[in-house]
Amino acid sequence: MLSIIVFGASGDLATKMTFPALFALYVRKIIPEDFQIIGYARSKLSQEAANKIVTAHIPIDDTVGASQKALNTFVEHYKYVPGTYDKPESFEMLNSIIAEKETAPASECTRIFYLVLPPHLFAPVSELIKSKAHPNGMVTRLIVEKPIGFDYKSADAILSDLSKHWSAKDTFKVDHFLGEDMIDGFTAIRFANSMFEPIWNREHIESVRVDFREDFGCEGRGGYFEGAGILRDVVQNHLLQLLTLLCIEEPKSQDAEDIIKCKVDFLKSLHPVSKEDIVYGQYTKSANGKVPGYRELDGVADDSEVSTFCALQLRSEAPRWKGIPIIISAGKGLDRDYFEARITFKRREGGMFPTVDSSNVLVLRVYPKEFIALKGHIKQPGFSRQIVPVTLDVKYPEAFPDTWIHKAYEVVIADAINGKHTHFISDDEVRTSWKIFDDVLDTTGDLSPLPYAFGSHHGPDATLEFFKKRNLEWD
């Protein structure tokens, strides 16, 4: 018997991500037939109202088995329970409700508690779960969502509190980007292809980049973003995780423990980011005045110095990467919308084609459409001896038309069900990643964000100078 208990079940993330992922896993029969899902939150909702929250963002698609009939059956397994996050009696009640359908012996039951909650609630809720809803002899797992902390100090406190009651084996810390199929495949691209590994180093690579650009702003999220900013929102977690998979040494195996060890080793090779290696920006209203600036949004202070853009350089002491520019850029309110990693190889000096003036580039696009592209050169057909640039690419949907490419949350929840940590982050990764950015989290004074108009190509003008100083180009 599998019981999945979703805390924060009336919230936006649970509605848009958690429940659709659970339904997809149900349709694909990854969730066993004998299961129940319990939603828990402070909101006092009827079961009918709670069911509407569950189904609000689940699309019906008969071609993949996600029929209305399947959804109706799925909802029959769902029960909503209102309660507090700080009273033992609420958790005793929850435990009784879970147990009503657990007719098998404890050794044959699994409970997964998924905390889709603000981080300040992780410790008290996890402690009450352990003391009031954790039967002896039963497999019980805890999933916690990002963000884990606001800086190194707060993250360390949260992790320490969690570890008092839950073992690392039973705790699953989500960075859902690790469930993205393209990101999950980075290690295969690197280590399963013999042509890449020999040249994946400072002798042959000019730069490593991760670019995250959004053509929309913070509408509807102003209050959240005021407490986060772009670095906390996506850089310290999602983008750094992607970058780490590009730069690690080869793990001994595909086991989570071996991969995590190599990730931590690389993260520890990185210097803390200095003020000289980062540019912050904040978007103002669009040039035509139709889109409001960040400071004009609900929940945002009139004099806010929260960043909606940043470009930064990481510096590694790892022999493979020492001296190579490692760049992360992320921004909202730009003129394009995509997320990709880019490896630029050094130009070949001399040779029989000295006029070739552009580098080979490997592009790994995560969205909007997953693809792998290698930019190179060939001779133009015909009598000409001219060398022209070409792009060789693999588009995932076209290359795998009959394959269900799972969404990120489906992957991470499936891992938790199976007790695998492959697509989760470790305590060491969380602590080390915060240390890298702690010195540049305060976006006031010298690090005050520079203005750029909504719809800008490159964020603040200082970005262009930032790239020029590093012999790179913004594109």
Swiss-Prot record:
Q: Name one GO cellular component term.
A: cytosol
According to UniProt, the reaction catalysed is: D-glucose 6-phosphate + NADP(+) = 6-phospho-D-glucono-1,5-lactone + NADPH + H(+)
Lineage, broadest ranks: Eukaryota, Fungi, Dikarya, Ascomycota, Taphrinomycotina
Q: Which InterPro entries is this protein grouped with? A: G6P_DH (IPR001282), G6P_DH_C (IPR022675), G6P_DH_NAD-bd (IPR022674), NAD(P)-bd_dom_sf (IPR036291)
The places in or outside the cell where this protein is found are: Cytoplasm
Organism whose genome encodes this protein: Schizosaccharomyces pombe (strain 972 / ATCC 24843) (Fission yeast)
Is the keyword Ligase assigned to this protein? no
Q: What does this protein do?
A: Catalyzes the rate-limiting step of the oxidative pentose-phosphate pathway, which represents a route for the dissimilation of carbohydrates besides glycolysis. The main function of this enzyme is to provide reducing power (NADPH) and pentose phosphates for fatty acid and nucleic acid synthesis.
Which key words are in the record? Carbohydrate metabolism, Cytoplasm, Glucose metabolism, NADP, Oxidoreductase
Q: Where does NADP(+) 1 bind?
A: R42, K146
Q: What is this protein called?
A: Glucose-6-phosphate 1-dehydrogenase gcd1
Disulfide pairs?
A: none
